[in-house]
Amino acid sequence: MDQSQKEVWDDSELRNAFETALHEFKKYHSIEAKGGVSDPDSRLDGEKLISAARTEESISKLEEGEQMINQQTETTLEGDTHIQQFADNKGLSDEKPETRAAETHQEFMEVPPPIRGLTYDETYKKLIMSWYYAGYYTGLAEGLAKSEQRKD
């Protein structure tokens, strides 16, 4: 089975499958362009209820996490003040250790909140990767088309 390099690297089937998937995607996602659903709020009530339930669940999980972080931070700050007092050569400073610890604490607490409503399961990861590969092969196809046009 001696295959030439051209046969080995032939991705025409993959490109055809991608073009078919792209055509199908455009067909189903062009409903708004054809004037089908113009108001995004006119979706089914069931979808609204499900998304609201997921949002409430996410909010409650975030609040629980924030409470745990606050409790851990309080115990950490208490320990930090004792460490800072003994770490200083003099043992005392002009500034209170609680003030320094609070300033340090504020620097670390300015992390942006996570995006609500997302769950990172295997299906979601596969969806993200499929969009990545779709974009990659779209760019590849466009690049090849442009290079073929330049040759002509």
From Swiss-Prot:
Residues 26-51 are annotated as: Interacts with yip11/gem2. It comes from the Eukaryota. Keywords: mRNA processing, mRNA splicing, Nucleus, RNA-binding. Residues 130-152 are annotated as: May interact with gem8. Residues 91-108 have a biased composition (Basic and acidic residues). GO terms for molecular function: RNA binding. The SMN complex catalyzes the assembly of small nuclear ribonucleoproteins (snRNPs), the building blocks of the spliceosome, and thereby plays an important role in the splicing of cellular pre-mRNAs. Most spliceosomal snRNPs contain a common set of Sm proteins smb1, smd1, smd2, smd3, sme1, smf1 and smg1 that assemble in a heptameric protein ring on the Sm site of the small nuclear RNA to form the core snRNP (Sm core). This is SMN complex subunit smn1. It comes from Schizosaccharomyces pombe (strain 972 / ATCC 24843) (Fission yeast). The lineage of its organism: Eukaryota, Fungi, Dikarya, Ascomycota, Taphrinomycotina. The gene is smn1.
